[in-house]
Structure formats: C-alpha cells, structure tokens
Amino acid sequence: VSDWYDSAILGGLEALSSGITCVAEITATGAACTATQKLGMRSVIYREVGAMDKRRVDFAMRSAAADVEKWQEEYGSDLLTIGIASGPFFACHPLVFSKVVEYADDTLPIAMQIAASREEYNFIKRGSSPFSVHKEELHRGYVEVPPWLPTGVTPVNYALNWGAFDSKNILAVHCVHVNDEDLEQLKAHDVAIAVCQRCNAQLGMGVPPLTDYLRAGMRVGLGTDSPAATDSTDMFIEMRTGMLIQRAMGRGMFLDSSTMLEMATMGGARALRMEDKIGSLEVGKHADIVAVDLSGSHQTPTTDP
C-alpha cells in the first residue's frame, strides 16, 4: 500500500510540475485519493471493477461499491470526485459493463479503456490475438475460454450491445481502433474521449483518429496515461508529440498549438463535465492558473509548435 501511495504522490508531483491541476485516474486502490488530496489537486478517481468469470461479477461489484462509499465518505469534496470504471475489455465479463452503468445510475461518472490496441480489437471481434493464446492460463480456475468470444463486432459495438454507454457521464480512454460506425455511436451517446497518443506510440498500439473526433464535434481531452506506459506525465510533451503524430499520419494540418492547448484545458474540462468550473480563466471559475517560464536558453527562440 505504501508503494502505491508513494507512486501516486510522485505521479501527482510530476503532473503539477507541468501545469496539470486536475487528473482523472482509474484505480483499484485508494492511494490516488490520498495522494491527490495531500497535493491539493483536483481529481476524479474511478474505482475499477474487473471480473472475467460471470460468477464473480456480483462480488466484484459489491467490493467496488463498498470502496466507492468509503472513498466518498473519507475524501469526497469539491476537489475530489469519486467515480466507477469497468476493467479492460479483454479482462472482463461483459456483464461488468451493464452492472457498472446500473450502479452509477447517472449520478457517478464512468470511465472505461476501450479499443486501445489491435490485439484487443482482434480478441473481441475474432477471438484470436496474443490475449487468446494465454487466456486459459490467465483465467484458470474461473473459466477455461471466454464463451462469449468471438463476438464478430468491434469493441465499441461490443460495449454498446451490453449497455456500456447508457449513462450521462462517460469517459472512454484511448479509442484508437475505431471505424466510422463506432465514431457515430460514440457521438450519439455523447461519450467523451481521452486520447493518450504518447502511450499509444510507445506501446505500438496505433494512432487514434483524433482529427475525426474533432471534426465530429465530440468532447475530446488529452491524457498522458501513467508513467508505467509513458516516460512522464508532462502535458506539454503530450501536446507537442500528439500534434506531430497526427501530422505525420497526414490526418490534417489544421492541428496547431492553439487546438492542442484547447484540448489540454477546456477539452479535458468538458470531457470530465467540469467546464463550468475549470478549463479557462473566466469570472466565476476556479483560478487554476499555470505560469510558463520562457526565460531558459532552451526556450530561445520559442518555437511553434
């Protein structure tokens, strides 16, 4: 537990050092609650629920519900919001998705990691990928082979079929392997997207169709993922790298510094349904102000991007 707390503190300090004052974290422990409270950061902490065996879903939900209630009592404040999240789609029985939505009951924010990698896509749609090679070993004692696979549909349609989008405040993380039909479904359900492009690039997961999301008028924010998946939680590096990745893919030169900055500020606020409180410097909003020092030699000349 102390290692989790120390890790959360370090991650929070690194985020603050690059100007991040609000974080969204998916976790199975309360370490992030303690750490962000200690650091005075604004946060949405999602309690993750995971169970591959249908027989363990109710137990997993009861455990998560107990943690949510405990965290709300201990940490709930204007700075800290508690939510709930389904585990990775390749490690969850689909009943988890509908149970999470039922429990949230349009009052708790929901997060999910979806369509992150080609391996996940193939596992869900075709039942064949590196995940399927090890699934018997990974889930021995629960189920030998997930009986619902292959589904023949994309991860987004899979989630849709199980009611995973039937809530008012959903944050979908990654959304890399998404087709036009998937995008329309995400937009129709007003699902917010958190793109984590450095993580996707470092792990060879692919490139999200960011420009398509923006053109569709969807709520999109920038995420850094965690230091376990990227070298840092520096939002300035995330903005610059993300823009260059999209340009290199030929997905639109309209992405400029202003667009990326907007996604890192107001975009993130909208994705978390906090645009009335944070994301811009306006009368009536919280004064989460970041000062950027441009006096260093590495900032001369200042480039754009």
PLM regions with names:
Residues 161-167, 211-296:
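His/Asp/Glu-enriched, well-ordered alpha-helical/loop segment
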Residues 40-43, 101-109, 164-168, 185-194, ...:
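Glycine-enriched alpha-helix->loop->beta-strand junction motifs that scaffold or abut catalytic
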Residues 23-24, 110, 221-222:
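Hydrophobic residues within beta-strands of alpha/beta enzymes
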Residues 19, 36, 84, 113, ...:
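Divalent metal-coordination and catalytic microenvironments
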Residues 1-33:
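Metal-associated gating/positioning segment near the N- to mid-region
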Residues 178-191, 196-202:
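Long hydrophobic segments that form regular secondary structure
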Residues 118-132, 183-187, 204-213, 230-245, ...:
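Histidine/acidic-residue-rich catalytic or RNA/ligand-binding cores of hydrolases
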Residues 33-173:
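Metal-coordinating catalytic core of metallo-dependent amide/deamination hydrolases
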